[in-house]
Amino acid sequence: MLNARLNELKETPQPPFIYAVTEDGNFFLSKTKDAFTGIAVSKEDGIDTALSALTREIERVRQFGFTASEYARAKADYLRQLESAYNERDKVKNNAYVNEYVRHFIDNEPIPGIDAEYAIMNQIAPNIPVEAINSFIPSLVNDSNIVVNIFCPEKEGMKYPTEQEIMDVLNKVKAEKLTAYEDKVSDEPLIAEQPKAGTIVKTEEGPFGSTVLTLSNG
């Protein structure tokens, strides 16, 4: 859900970053440590802007959580993907099983099998309220033990941010008075009124064996 918000920012006319994503899992330098991680890719002169935007959206989620409509969409998407995996369970390639066993051995990831996972999660997921998700977020995203890594090309004229400049960005966002995210989803139909059906007034042969139809309504 947070990644969906970041994707919205990426699609704005003047996006604050080229790409951004968050995840919770292994710390990228160590598989023995779990960490909530935010990643932003920026232009060479947009490091501060990207870091600010990423930090701001993470902080917004920490303060206000997710909306019921966001959660409903995310839950529906998850259950739809789970159902698709269940329906395609007889078409799984061998490498998918190999990768699953590797993750089980290295990361201790459970491997109940899609039949059990489908049955279990269809009982559990619908009964987890958004309030439970939001109450968990502060324990996942907090102010302790924060690590910031900046990866930049080594080139002449490149301005590398200092530790103090990075701290200033984080502190500035922390001091902002944020507002809750507004989920601007419309339930209005794409077309308010269905156009009247036209008729085919002309048929021509097109390129590559295609047929070009001219309709009465344009």
Protein language model regions, located:
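Proteolytic maturation boundary segments
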Residues: 7, 72-76, 80-83, 103-218
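Active/ligand-binding-proximal structured segments within catalytic/core domains
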Residues: 1-2, 218
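M16 family metallopeptidases and their MPP-like homologs
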Residues: 2-130, 145-153
